[in-house]
Amino acid sequence: MITRPVRPFSPHDPLGLMPKQFPSGFLVAVLLTASGLLWAVMFFGPLAHLSRLSGGMTPFDIRPWGYSYAEARAFLEAIGAEGRAYYASPELILDAFYPPLYAVSRGLALWWLTMPGRIGKAPVPLKVRWALIAVPILMATLDVIENGCIVVMLWMWPRLSNGVVEISSLATQVKIIAGALTETLMAGLAVVWLLRLFARRVYD
């Protein structure tokens, strides 16, 4: 009788469902590239077009300091009916795909970078790894909230709710902070990994 070898229990994969090399570096690279391309399409496409329609104002999505009720009304009025329709589609349609892609690509990248042996001999504690992954998930969640608020603002126009604008503005500000923190963490871990990789190749 042939028996299948039993995989040792791992707290990183308690059900034993993940392949040993999941995620692969190739998968992480593909997802990061796809996320970057989608961001570039939105930034240089719809968001740039909305900025031109408004006479140079910055769309809600990329205002790091948020926006007041008066600023939100001024922007939506400046882009006109054409711009408000354009904001709903294609911009918000494209932006519906960005948050999940961002969370998955950055989450898997952080998981990959903290796999045993990548940034140190000792394994990174599981709680730390989950905490790292929580940052891009937070960013994506806030992006979804922001998008929902913008949909409500476009739908209610010209009647704007001050509460909706405040929630949207706060979501935008914290989203940008969480995004910057995610990129900083990922870049820092990548530098440590590359330095260790270089050192091993030099001294081995």
Predicted ranges, named:
Residues 3-4, 195-204:
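Short, charged juxtamembrane terminal tails flanking transmembrane helices
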Residues 17-27, 80-90, 121-131, 160-174:
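Membrane-interfacial loop-to-transmembrane-helix junctions in polytopic alpha-helical membrane proteins
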Residues 38, 100-108, 139, 181-188:
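Alpha-helical transmembrane segments
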Residues 89-104, 170-181:
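Membrane-interface loop-to-helix entry segments
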Residues 104-152:
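Hydrophobic alpha-helical transmembrane segments of integral membrane proteins
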Residues 133-188:
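Alpha-helical transmembrane segments of multi-pass integral membrane proteins
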